Amino acid sequence: MPRAPALLFSCLLGLCALVPRLPGLNICTSGSATSCEECLLIHPKCAWCFKEDFGSLRSVTSRCDLKANLIRNGCGVEFESPASSTQVLRSLPLSSKGSSPAGSDVIQLTPQEVTVTLRPGDRTAFQLQVRQVEDYPVDLYYLMDLSLSMKDDLENIRSLGTKLAEEMRKLTSNFRLGFGSFVDKNISPFSYTAPRYQTNPCIGYKLFPNCVPSFGFRHLLPLTDRVDSFNEEVRKQRVSRNRDAPEGGFDAVLQAAVCKEKIGWRKDALHLLVFTTDDVPHIALDGKLGGLVQPHDGQCHLNEANEYTASNQMDYPSLALLGEKLAENNINLIFAVTKNHYMLYKNFTALIPGTTVEILHGDSKNILQLIINAYNSIRSKVELSVWDQPEDLNLFFTATCQDGVSYPGQRKCEGLKIGDTASFEVSVEARSCPSKHVQHTFTLRPVGFRDSLEVGVTYNCRCGCSAGLEPDSARCSSNGTYVCGLCECNPGYLGTRCECQEGESQSGYQNLCREAEGKPLCSGRGQCSCNQCSCFESEFGKIYGSFCECDNFSCARNKGVLCSGHGECHCGECKCHAGYIGDNCNCSTDISTCQARDGHICSDRGHCVCGQCQCTEPGAFGETCEKCPTCPDACSTKRDCVECLLLHSGSSADNQTCQNLCKDEVITRVDTIVKDDQEAVLCFYKTAKDCVMMFTYSELPSGKSNLTVLREPECGTAPSAMTILLAVVGSILLTGFALLVIWKLLVTIHDRREFAKFQSERSRARYEMASNPLYRKPISTHTVDFTFNKFNKSYNGTVD
């Protein structure tokens, strides 16, 4: 699958190479070249015949044709057809070890100097080899964040120098160590600037009330092989305090990179810059918050006390400036950052070449192993970088890594061991000729290496026959210059021999100015003089051709741009620059833009067409078809290989089948799997014996998969029969008890609801007082009214 786009690209290039030979499509004769130089620019297969009596005296364009056609038509050997070429000027052999005292004779790249002579459109190639030699000197500068949050980290690295030197001497016999620290710019709002904080910014901070004033960067220890000096310098350090969360570490990184003499970087050594912090960095434009509008100048600003003096004068450096200065000084930057900021710094590594990132524990206890891992990672890969590439050059790379397989479009090899050699084929192609006859130079350098390859470029744009030009030649009626087999007439003269003056006309021969019978004279865009067309001038461009039938402005456009800006218009047809095809040259043949992060073209889920991925896998999308929720996951696709080769549990476990299944895998067997590896995907599946098999996979830039597999699957012990019986009985009893509890709970809830309802109805009842009509009281009361006449008295009372 990944070879398909490359094969398609090769076929397209092959088709383009055959175009001049196809009938009716001879680009050389249809280009209407009127001089040798114009002919050579049309196509690298075109040649110019400078034989005096060759071809039609009327047709100049017949001299520009394919070389085979010119020879067949009688040109002989009098033709110009230069080809691109390569010459190796200096090629010292690669070294095997780097343990010499001075290291000056250590060669890690060959050749060292090459010159290429280029004809536009004609590609030439050369090979270069890179080797990570054994026992190469190492300079390591430890740059530490000394803000208050790093207090516990400072305690844990006080003896780092001794331990680090012991481990590094297992890898190289020539190791040096340096130390520097940083906090942030000592201006508001980055630091506490009130007078009471000038000597102690920790005043009022209960957890740690005493610390040193804030500072930008301090270079504390030049690179030295005395590790006790490192330990002693670390013990002297005290933390400081800044106001905001981000730190000013990138100021320190830039100074450590450009102050070569102060730091003590050796010319012939591997340069490692370890950057430790627990927070995010300030970057360019952040300084404007503090009134710093001057961009960083990328220069060294350390005073006699080795303190950064421009901290409060210039803005923070940009990522582009950092990458440029680190690359100029061959420095590999190692970000040692806490886990919560890992992804941010991981994104930085894509913008700063030669940079790696490792996860630092909160107390820096893993810093030793972190540095060793980063060193091994750096030494296991080689990546080419290009410096000062001329704008009119195209470069094409093909990498051949340790597996011996060629990978077109790749300029990086990973998974190398010390002593392995990576080979690269570099093809160079000129798109056009420079306006002036100049020689360009560009440099190829592996990232982080001192060694480089200087490539000189000369352009083969002039014809050798031009050296024999004859001004006012008798061959040109003394009215022009004879050069390369034809006459270049002086102003006012026309004709193949400059025998006529402009304005002269012979009506009997005007048909010589017609392209075909019935066609207008000079295609209606010129004047027939001396039986030859003199083309009009146009504000849109140039009109040319024997019959003024051609121009350089009537070609297809893309978004209003002629030939998309990637080609030249010749006689109504776009002649595309190298690297572009199509009617309007809008289709790029560069497949690097289709390369996914894993190194595969369109993530193996599509084709690269005109520099863009067209996803063919159902459900795949993204710029490189990297997203595909419905695609079979990689764990499933790698399982057959793991089963067949390591577990022998596949349906066909013979060696040949396993080799076919695992042809694109690099397999490592281990006893334990690292489950929190940020660079790999953790996979696991259940075997036929109910065991769990785990493995991790990651993609190498070469296109292969790196599989790390357990030696044996993890199997649990089978439970006994008594355990199963007790579990079943216990579950039954527990279920019954649970059901009883639920039933009792439901009954209780129901009773409580009924009682509450009764109480509610009872409280709403009302009663009135009444008497029984059948009830009579035992006591009756009567009223008697009588008069005692005898005494003349009366009595009105009650008698019981």
UniProtKB/Swiss-Prot annotation:
Source taxonomy: Eukaryota, Metazoa, Chordata, Craniata, Vertebrata
Domains: entry comment: The VWFA domain (or beta I domain) contains three cation-binding sites: the ligand-associated metal ion-binding site (LIMBS or SyMBS), the metal ion-dependent adhesion site (MIDAS), and the adjacent MIDAS site (ADMIDAS). This domain is also part of the ligand-binding site.
Main location: membrane
Gene: ITGB5
Role description: Integrin alpha-V/beta-5 (ITGAV:ITGB5) is a receptor for fibronectin. It recognizes the sequence R-G-D in its ligand.
Organism (species): Bos taurus
Disulfide pattern: 28-46, 36-463, 39-64, 49-75, 202-211, 259-300, 401-413, 433-461, 465-484, 476-487, 489-498, 500-530, 513-528, 522-533, 535-548, 550-571, 555-569, 563-574, 576-585, 587-610, 594-608, 602-613, 615-625, 628-631, 635-683, 641-662, 644-658, 691-715
UniProt name for this protein: Integrin beta-5
Membrane topology of this protein: Single-pass type I membrane protein
Residues annotated with Phosphoserine modification: 771
